[in-house]
Amino acid sequence: MASPDKKSSLAALTLAAVGIVYGDIGTSPLYTMKEVFSKEHGLDLTPENLLGVVSLIVWGLIIIVSLKYVTLVLRANNRGEGGIMALMALALSSVTKNSRWYFPLMVMGLFGATLFYGDSVITPAISVLSAVEGLGVATSAFDPYVVPVTVAILVGLYSLQARGTAGIGKWFGPVMLIWFITLAVMGVVNIIDAPYILHALNPWHALHFLSGNGFLAFIALGAVVLAFTGAEALYADMGHFGAKPIRMAWFLIAFPALSLNYLGQGALLLLNPEAVTNPFYQQLGAWSIYPLVALSTMAAIIASQATISGTFSMTKQAIALGFLPRMKIEFTSASQIGQIYIPAVNWLQMIVVVLAVIGFGSSSNLAAAYGIAVTATMMVTTVLTFFVIRYRWKYNLILCVAATGFFLVIDLSLFSANMLKLFHGGWFPLLLGVVLFTLMLTWKRGRELVFENLQKHAIPLEDFLASLFISPPTRVPGTAIFLRGESDGVPHAMLHNLSHNKVLHERVVFLTVRMMEVPYVPKADQVRIEHLGDDCYQMNVTYGFKNVPDIPAALDLAKEQGLEFEMMETSFFIARQTVVANPVRGMALWREHIFVAMSRHARGAADYYQIPSNRVIELGTKVEI
């Protein structure tokens, strides 16, 4: 029997998961039904079509969210961490680097991750915009103010990011719980008025709708997918809450509430087809519009916050895995290490979100932009999951194909339906994804070219030290730490120091930082020291992609292995690389120029590794790619 403390902890995590994980999918009822039956889709609002659409949505929640994500994908975790970056790292670890699958899997996972950035722009825009549009249901006099009010809310939200969410974050769970209870109550009220809608629970109506409406049903699928946006968040946030609280929050709260509300909106439209212009806000009558606008705006802000935080987390992982240059990362909570803020990402995302709101102008226009990136990410997740369960878990091939193939057919159907919206806004998140994909691959390849160049001119460290101490230079008091990449040979900073200063510190440490394709490396395994002789040491510091790189903390850990450091007697020598594009070799010249620009704006190693600036000596070196 579980102890009371464990039960209360599980309940707290479940409530927190309701607030963070389900904000996106929880706000989908604001716009999904409205979009399915919009005039542009040409689908008649008949009782038969209503039953079919509601049945599609409810069974989509069962198959896509409950079975695929909650039951299968949550099991494919990378040491407890989820998200497409973690899944990509797990899939890559399932095959060797020489495997024919390695590069395609990396490209696929990377493209899925960049599509997440496209989603992260659309989610705040469509969530807040659709919430504020409720004012227009009350009176058309509010229509001119919908976009300005939305922009003001979003600018305010992004402006507060630097302060962190630790203070208001504790209210996310209770507010979203009230939101889901409200969804359920509204649904039940309308179902009581038109219980015939419960026939939609029979999947035959979904199948009959698809077979009986031909191309119109195919078009409708592109709008139905709006009910499943946010499913990826279930997996992405697993590291914060664990699989069990996420599952409990889904099956006990989110899924019943969403199903009841979609059934309720269907019941409302059976009785009052004119409500199709915005069925969500007309479920309880005119008296409820203003309270619902207030509550839905809070829910939309929470959904947006979860997406923004997810973007910060994804960026940090991408930096650690070598797909993006180092950036300034601020920690906004002393107690919660996952609470981070990346200024460059925050302001750039805010600008793009505001432009999306102004450019598209309404949630209906944004809805056209939403589905392609979401369904493409779903496909990538399914394929990566196949490689994990087949090559890492060693499940039977037929079982793996059957399990993931079923979901892949659904993903492909939804993706194909959304491709019809490519020229009606679907290009927007795809363009964002392609731009970021190009930048990430360019950075990854550029770093490889820099490494190859340095390797060509590298002097083996052991041979160099052996020859150096035949006629040793003058030793001066203190400790010198030279940052050195894996297999880099003698650090350029050391060669420059010996060339210019003609001296060597009495203790020399070569420090190599390695990032592993796992979320976390325990402190006990982070530091390894090898004695090279003559008071020279090789110190390897290993982090996972969700660890916080902290060299001073690593030096403290070195005490346990007999190497103590006094910071005021320690100097860090770091080579500052100036990268120069070479038209003869390497990448295409335009990509090389992009890489050079990214390198120029990358955060310095000293800042990124939290090395005190007054202990750092930077020495320049030029590298051609």
UniProtKB/Swiss-Prot annotation:
Reactions mediated catalytically: K(+)(in) + H(+)(in) = K(+)(out) + H(+)(out)
Membrane topology classification: Multi-pass membrane protein
InterPro entries per record: K+_transporter, K_trans_C, K_trans_N, Kup
Entry keywords, A to Z: Cell inner membrane, Cell membrane, Ion transport, Membrane, Potassium, Potassium transport, Symport, Transmembrane, Transmembrane helix, Transport
Lineage of origin: Bacteria, Pseudomonadati, Pseudomonadota, Betaproteobacteria, Burkholderiales
Broad class of where this protein is predominantly found: membrane
Organism: Herminiimonas arsenicoxydans
Domain of life: Bacteria
GO molecular function: potassium ion transmembrane transporter activity; symporter activity
Its biological purpose: Transport of potassium into the cell. Likely operates as a K(+):H(+) symporter.
UniProt record similarity statement: Belongs to the HAK/KUP transporter (TC 2.A.72) family.
Gene: kup
One Gene Ontology cellular component: plasma membrane
Protein name as annotated: Probable potassium transport system protein Kup
Positions of transmembrane segments: 10-30, 50-70, 102-122, 135-155, 172-192, 214-234, 251-271, 284-304, 340-360, 369-389, 397-417, 422-442
Location of this chain's protein in the cell: Cell inner membrane
